[in-house]
Structures are given as C-alpha cells and as structure tokens.
Regions:
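Active-site glycine-rich loop that binds ribose-phosphate moieties when present
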Residues: 90, 107-117, 141-157
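Glycine-/charge-enriched secondary-structure boundary and capping motifs
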Residues: 74-85, 99-100, 159-185
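Glycine- and other small-residue-rich loops at beta-strand/loop junctions that grip anionic moieties
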Residues: 60, 142-145, 166-169
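Glycine-rich phosphate/pyrophosphate-binding loop regions near the starts of catalytic domains
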Residues: 1-72, 76-133
Length: 185
C-alpha cells in the first residue's frame, strides 16, 4: 500500500485482541465482527483524539483468510466511519498453519499539521462521554450506550468546541484526566 503524506506529522496507534472471539480455544466467547469492530475502534479513537486525519487501517489476523472475511468487511466499514477510504484498508491473515485462538492486531496511520495538535486551555471543563468497558470484566456487547461510537467522536472533534480529547482505556478516567492535565501547560 502506498500513500502520499499530505501533512508534516504522522500519528500511529495500534491495539490487539487475543483469546476473545469465536474460535475453539478462546477464553472469552464473542462475535468475530464485534471483535473486529472493537479492535479497530480503540486505535481509531486514539488517532482521531490526537487531532489527526486517519488515512490507513492495517489489520493482522491470526486466522485463515476465508474465516477472516467477515472481520475484514467490518474493518472496511469502521474505516469508512472514520473517514478512511475502504481501499486504504490492508492486512494479513494466517494461511500457513491452523490456529485455534482469535488473534487480532489493528494499526491506524493518520496525519496532521504540527499546529493542529489538540491542547486543553485554561478554564476548559472536563467532560466524560461513555464509560471504560473491557472484557472479560464487563459485558462488551453491541448496542451498549456506554460504548462511544467513532462517528460520535469524529463529530465532537470537528465541532470546534473540543480542545482536547482522549479515549479512556483500562487505566480509567482519573489516570486519563491526569494525562490531559500534564500536557495542558
């Protein structure tokens, strides 16, 4: 895959899912399309929240190409939701050996101008949208209101009213708020 870089800064984020899915030796059973959705969602949110425009989605799937097709279709749909051309979705599957556990890796590559780096301003208010949810401790089922959608974050970032944004991961809201405060100057 070749891509022209129309800006001066690359923003790269990645995430993995392992042992969560429909395969025989998975520890936590889950729909493969939903696994793909969540696997793409985390790095897409990280790139969008950094103020970058996502350009490329790279997926690495530890399963054969035929069984991976529903996941690849979901990656293309997620890419489109984030403003990525579905033709800029690329990746690899494991067709050389049989696998019995789900393994997903997703990398998002985005671009931004140096001056576009989001920065909190004095007097800004911290607002939480959604809640940190993670398997196996939580029921990570489709349709939960606490799971913020990529299109919602895109709209927030494009509104001009959000100065800084960060997806809350497994560290929790307090840890992420401290990260925002430490970069606010």
């Amino acid at each position: 895959l070749l891509a022209d870089i129309p800006a001066s800064r690359l923003v790269i984020a990645c995430d993995t899912i392992g042992g969560i899915g429909p395969r025989p030796d998975d520890s936590y059973p889950a729909d493969p399309v939903w696994c793909a959705h969540l696997g793409a969602r985390v790095p897409l949110l990280e790139v969008l929240c950094a103020g970058a425009r996502p350009l490329v989605l790279v997926d690495t799937l530890c399963q054969d190409s035929a069984s991976a097709q529903p996941m690849i279709a979901e990656f293309r749909r997620c890419a489109l939701d984030a403003g990525i051309d579905p033709d800029a979705v690329t990746g690899s599957t494991e067709d050389n050996v049989a696998t019995t556990q789900t393994g997903v890796g997703v990398t998002i590559i985005g671009v931004m101008h140096h001056e576009d780096l989001p920065k909190s301003l004095d007097g800004d208010v911290l607002v939480c949208v959604g809640a940190p949810i993670s398997a196996p401790d939580d029921d990570v089922a489709p349709g939960r209101r606490e799971i913020v959608d990529v299109t919602e974050v895109r709209a927030l970032m494009a509104s001009g009213k959000v100065h800084d944004c960060v997806p809350v991961g497994s560290h929790g809201v307090a840890w992420e708020a401290k990260q925002l405060a430490s970069t606010a100057g």
